[in-house]
Regions:
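Contiguous segments within soluble domain cores/interaction surfaces
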Residues: 1-93
Length: 93
């Protein structure tokens, strides 16, 4: 469980359908609230890459988010969208 106001490392690993790690173009991290409204869009660079296809971002959970948020890593591979999405539960205490 993650606390409001705390930092959380959001990670993803992009792979092809055959399981090969890939580096998509134009990688972004999108944060959604529980109503699926976009809170923030963050460009992801090579500084956020740990290995082929593996990315992270240290995100500070805003105090005004209730219950959970959803994060989505997205990019373009071979002219097609590729994405990974996950829900993060949060609490105040």
């Amino acid at each position: 469980m993650i606390f409001k106001g705390d930092s959380v490392r959001l990670q993803c690993h992009f792979k092809t359908f055959s399981g090969v790690s890939i580096n998509p173009d134009n990688v972004e991290l999108v944060i959604y609230d529980k109503a699926k409204n976009i809170i923030e869009t963050i460009p992801i660079t090579d500084e956020n890459k740990t290995a082929t296809g593996q990315y992270y971002y240290d995100y500070v959970v805003p105090d005004d988010i209730d219950e959970y948020f959803i994060f989505e890593y997205r990019g373009i591979h071979n002219t097609k969208p590729i994405l990974a999405r996950e829900k993060v539960n949060i609490k105040f205490n």
